[in-house]
């Protein structure tokens, strides 16, 4: 999902001072006194109980402290800018990843639409297969009828063999009339069933290929939870920031300085750890991009193989149709041969009936035509020979037709065996491809789970950044108050220094006036000297009192 830039980042151009105060752990402005602006005394010494010296304070350490403060502030500003740039880069990366996910989902929706279309085609092919199966069943029934008719012809030939025995008895012509009236039933194309199992198996293969295409994988990534020490450190800093600051001695100031340094080191460690986590996230994203490109290549290869398989299926269908045409032509030839054989059989039947009629007439005239008996026996022998010849010819025709049918059946069985072997090879290859595809789908789901976990971590980091921004804003306010109080103290210090300089000038003026009076009045003696001595003693005591008051105020 895409995320815009954080409003806190856009509204925080003054976070440099706050970040410096947060890292250094500066005290609150209301508790900052004059001792905070002065260099700390060693913790081993004890503060002097007497008044401070009357001379003005040297400004050199304060200037040095201000320069160090500015350099640190610039350093923290640079670090903050780097952190902002990295956060912006992280947000851009997440937006790019969300766009990639949307594109991937669109591709999967297209694949689903193709799969639905393929299923519709498979349904239509199944309907056609059912219709062809019905036609095949009808052809098989017709074939069985043709076989029954051929068996009836065999029975008729058996009756012809027994024709000799029928000469001695009265023939019954009408018994054979129903058999003569039987007409040959035309045989339809029965070879279409030879290739039917092959076509159905190919259709089932295509259906399984389309059904096994998986839906859109959904999941989330699994990665390690980084930055566990950062929340603990931040909570510790918040608790220490909430502690009330009280007026402390110089020793406590030194201990606070060491604590501030420790906190600074801890914050630097946290920043380094967060930086390492961001680098690890960027490496994981690059790795996922590579895997995504590989998946795209594999998907294109699978689509190409699918198109090739469809082409092969169309080629097999065309070959099947050609083979069906050839078999139908063979069946038509066979039907023509059978019709010619039926005509010959009809002629033989007519001749046999004529012979039977002649034999019947001669049987009636046997008593009167004993002389013609031998001739009739010879004719009978000739007829038997003809019947034997006809039987042999019929047997030869049967063997020829049976051998032709056996050859065609063997050829169709061999072709079917080859097609089954090719289908088994294709199924084996399909099983391997299916297994590889399932493995890749599992890897993709794992990668999606890792991406979602990364998104959760990014949300946590953003929440942490917002908390830090709030702390920075509070520290910035405290720093502004501290600067205001420092300016007030500086103004009061300047006023005290001006007062001390004025007092010093007055003291020098009084001393010069006393020296002039001593030089210009040597004649007055001890009285005037005693008088002026008492006044000078009073003035010196007052000056000392004023100096002590000034030093107390400065302290």
Swiss-Prot record:
One Pfam assignment: Myosin_tail_1
Coiled coil: 72-161, 268-401, 432-522
Disulfide-linked positions: none
Top-level taxon of origin: Eukaryota
Basic and acidic residues bias (residue ranges): 136-159, 166-183
Keywords: Coiled coil, Phosphoprotein
Record region (Disordered): 1-68, 136-202, 214-254, 478-555
Biased segments, Low complexity type: 224-236
Annotated Pro residues bias: 37-61
Protein known as: Coiled-coil domain-containing protein 102A
Ranges of compositional bias, category Acidic residues: 536-555
Modified residues (Phosphoserine): 12, 26, 28, 542
One GO cellular component, as annotated: myosin complex
Organism: Bos taurus
SUPFAM superfamilies reported for this sequence: Myosin rod fragments
